[in-house]
Regions:
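Glycine-rich phosphate-binding loop of ATP-dependent small-molecule kinases
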Residues: 7-182
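Methionine residue identity
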Residues: 1-3
Length: 182
């Protein structure tokens, strides 16, 4: 039983990807004191990142994707808990309108971060490929258009100075079932 955590960092001129698999058993013995110390260290690093983003007028889009109950919202809450509210935005878009279905990337462009800001996306443009086809929110044509254009669109973001960090959270079906029934 475990959780798979994948992240990808897109920024000029490099693309970096890592896959980390966490086994829950490793963390069951983590006591509250050690947990608080580790959490504090991580939050200090997030504040340092935000200060650098502000100082250097960076634009960072953090995209959180994954299975339901895998921990996306909890992680976003952790990331943003001590950040300066004026320099980050939380974005969670619901079911797309008819116009948004036909102008998929424009739907997201209006929420991209400005200079000196961080945008935290609770789900991202990848819902077009990951969940919308199974929920009936997009046609095969929309799906294929997305798949044919997403890399070019992300290249445009990067060339415009936006750093994109994508996280994907996955848990096994048994763990997901337990969480949904809790």
């Amino acid at each position: 039983m475990g959780m798979i955590f994948v992240y990808t960092i897109l920024s000029f001129p490099k693309i970096y990807m890592s896959v980390i698999e966490y086994k829950f058993e490793q963390y069951k013995t983590l006591g509250p004191i050690i947990y608080k110390k580790e959490k504090y260290k991580l939050q200090v690093e997030l504040l340092k990142l935000q200060e650098d983003v502000i100082k250097n007028r960076r634009r960072i889009a953090l995209c959180f994707e994954g299975r339901d109950t895998a921990g996306k919202s909890s992680t976003i809450n952790f990331f943003s808990e001590h950040l300066r509210p004026s320099n980050f935005r939380y974005i969670h878009l619901g079911i797309p309108t008819k116009e948004e279905k036909n102008n998929w990337f424009q739907r997201w462009e209006k929420h991209l971060p400005e200079e000196g800001k961080i945008a935290l996306f609770d789900r991202s443009w990848y819902t077009r490929a990951l969940t919308e086809p199974t929920l009936g929110y997009c046609s095969k044509k929309h799906y294929e258009e997305f798949m044919n254009n997403v890399n070019r669109w992300e290249d445009k973001l990067i060339s415009n100075g936006i750093e994109v960090v994508k996280f994907y959270f996955s848990i096994d079906k048994d763990q997901q079932k337990r969480r949904l029934s809790a």
